[in-house]
Regions:
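Active-site-proximal cap/loop segments of hydrolase catalytic domains
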Residues: 1-171
């Protein structure tokens, strides 16, 4: 199918997936999501859709606002990273070209808002991690501050994302 990067479609698909998993005979009705980097970005969007059977999330190192955290830096355009992501993706059909979408939407508008999770909708317990030297830091901190769960934890660390994710102590 077509690939719409980092938008509400991810959240809606994830909602359906959570509810499908919860109905399986081997599931106790409780589901959770862990995600790092791009997968974390999807986790934010799924949790914002509030699937009834999502019991908690572990959101590690995930950008929330593509416009301010990835495509621009203090208002200065830098679409190269997103262009690299699109180039690296293997997709049989159409894939959204975020770097070039910046040319069509140079300001934070409805298009970019559709790619930002509605943080305030996230009410499940959340364990959020952010690396102090990584561009996902802002998404981790903003997400932690804005989600409405009374049970949320933020862990900031000094390392990059991948070694911490695959450390056996964290599995």
């Amino acid at each position: 199918g077509d690939v719409n990067l980092w938008g509400i479609e991810d959240g809606k698909d994830g909602y359906d997936y959570v509810e499908w998993i919860a109905k399986q005979p081997w599931c106790n009705g409780k589901t959770s999501f862990f995600g790092n980097s791009g997968v974390c970005m999807v986790v934010w969007r799924i949790a914002a859709q509030q699937p009834p059977h999502l019991s908690c999330i572990a959101a590690w190192e995930g950008t929330g606002n593509m416009y301010t955290e990835s495509l621009t830096f203090n208002g200065i355009p830098r679409p190269g990273f997103e262009n690299g992501i699109v180039t690296a993706c293997a997709c049989k059909n159409w894939i959204e070209d975020l770097g070039n979408m910046y040319l069509k939407h140079p300001y934070y508008d409805a298009y970019w808002r559709s790619k930002t999770p509605v943080w305030e909708n996230i009410k499940v317990p959340a364990y959020v991690c952010g690396g102090m030297c990584h561009f996902h830091l802002r998404g981790s901190v903003v997400g932690f501050r804005k989600i409405r769960s009374p049970k949320k934890w933020l862990r900031l660390h000094r390392d990059m994302e991948w070694p911490d994710t695959y450390n056996p102590d964290n599995m």
